[in-house]
UniProtKB/Swiss-Prot annotation:
Name of the protein: B3 domain-containing protein At1g32030
Coiled coil: none
Pfam name, any one: At2g31720-like
Keyword Nucleus: yes
CDD domains: B3_DNA
Gene Ontology molecular function, alphabetical: DNA binding
Biased composition (Polar residues): 76-99, 134-143
Gene Ontology CC terms, in alphabetical order: nucleus
Region (Disordered): 76-179
Superkingdom of origin organism: Eukaryota
Length: 333
């Protein structure tokens, strides 16, 4: 009897424990379902939002890829520790200029507060200026005093200093003094050249001139030598002089040889040319033509160049010859 009772009790306990376990399992499943049901919309929403943001980023990336990007070079800035300290001090100084959060009380005078702020800001500014310009011996207060003095007492335009300045500005620049061979010996190269050409007479300085624009123009093709500006006019023989006076053709004249500083010989013609003016009066001139353009080009002659013409005779027949002489270098003048 007792054995049957014990077996029945054990079976009952087993059924109770198995039913309790099933109930616990069912309760845990129901709790999990409820929690999962609450979290599912949140996960879905978060996934949708993440997907939307990803699509927006990809869209922006595709949009900016349409434009070329500018390459930027890497710049390495080496900062000076002293400069950093000055910057920090400048920041602290500028921050002390005006504190907007400081509101004066009802008992304080706004004008006194404003005056204090202005005085502190001006002193800070002057301190910064003095620190930035340590090499300047004058202080900022001296500069302000000088500025106020200049504004109060402007310079007098009629003072002696101002008049001297105006006079110096209005004075024309001195013209270049042309080089002259007067009273000087003939250049050495010309003397040697006469020796090789069997010179029999000369050399003689007959003319000096600062070249004009017409003297170097290819259209004119002549060197004009006014008769009244000749240094000497006895370089022609009576026969040559009569030929020049009798000839009326512009292309005829007395044949001669011209030697340049490079010791190159050129065939030229000396011609008489009468220049008539609007007043009716005329002037007599000698002109070296027929080959003058080649001489200008070979010797690179330009307007305002100083030249001199020398005459000499060569050979047994005393053929008329000229020499083109330029000023010597400055160190030999």
């Amino acid at each position: 009897m007792s054995t049957y009772y014990n077996d029945h009790l054990a079976a009952a306990e087993k059924d109770i424990s198995s039913s309790n376990f099933c109930n616990l399992v069912d309760a845990s499943v129901m709790l999990y379902d409820e929690e999962h049901r609450d979290l599912l919309p949140k996960k879905v929403n978060s996934r949708c939002q993440a997907k939307t943001k990803k699509q927006e980023k990809e869209s922006d990336k595709r949009f900016f890829d349409l434009f070329p990007k500018k390459r930027r070079t890497s710049v390495v800035t080496v900062r000076n520790p002293e400069q950093n300290q000055q910057n920090l001090h400048r920041v602290s100084t500028s921050s002390s200029l005006l504190d907007l959060n400081t509101i004066p009380g009802d008992s304080s005078d706004p004008r006194n507060e404003l005056q204090g702020l202005l005085s502190s800001s001006s002193s800070s500014f002057l301190g910064d200026y003095e620190r930035k310009t340590p090499q300047n011996a004058s202080s900022s207060s001296t500069l302000l005093a000088e500025y106020n003095t200049e504004m109060a007492n402007p310079p007098n335009p009629n003072s002696e200093t101002s008049l001297k300045r105006k006079h110096s500005d209005s004075e024309p620049k001195k013209a270049k003094t042309p080089y002259s061979w007067k009273g000087r010996e003939a250049p050495e190269w010309l003397v040697k050249m006469m020796g090789t050409m069997q010179g029999s007479e000369g050399p003689r300085l007959i003319y000096e001139k600062t070249l004009t624009e017409t003297d170097v123009k290819p259209v004119q093709s002549r060197l004009l030598m006014p008769f009244n500006t000749l240094i000497r006019n006895d370089f022609l023989t009576p026969v040559e002089l009569r030929i020049l006076l009798e000839l009326e053709d512009d292309t005829d004249g007395v044949g001669a040889t011209l030697v340049d500083p490079w010791e190159v010989k050129w065939g030229v013609i000396l011609k008489k040319r009468e220049m008539k003016k609007y007043s009716g009066k005329g002037s007599l001139n000698y002109a070296i033509i027929c080959g003058w353009n080649d001489i200008v080009e070979a010797n690179v002659l330009e307007k305002d160049d100083d030249i001199s013409i020398w005459s000499f005779r060569r050979g047994r027949n005393g053929i008329l010859s000229f020499a083109l002489v330029l000023p010597p270098p400055p160190d030999m003048a």
